[in-house]
Amino acid sequence: MPNLWFLLFLGLVAAMQLLLLLFLLLFFLVYWDHFECSCTGLPF
């Protein structure tokens, strides 16, 4: 039984890390797009 709980906990941690990585990638893409637009929009 402890092995099952350990695998469940490990899967939950892996899923949380994957979700966090996905959110970080999405935020980076949005921020990079906004940064690129603001850079190209500047007159100088």
From Swiss-Prot:
GO cellular component: host cell membrane; membrane
Localization (cell): Host membrane
Coiled coil: none
Highest taxon of source: Viruses
GO biological process, one term: symbiont-mediated transformation of host cell
Keyword GTP-binding among UniProt keywords: no
Region (Cellular DNA synthesis induction) location: 32-44
Keyword terms: Early protein, Host membrane, Membrane, Oncogene
Membrane topology note: Peripheral membrane protein
Similarity annotation: Belongs to the papillomaviridae E5 protein family.
UniProt function note: E5 can induce cellular DNA synthesis. It seems to interact with a 16 kDa cellular protein. E5 seems to activate the PDGF receptor.
Quaternary structure annotation from Swiss-Prot or TrEMBL: Dimer or monomer.
Protein name: Protein E5
Organism encoding this protein: Bovine papillomavirus type 1
Encoding gene (name): E5
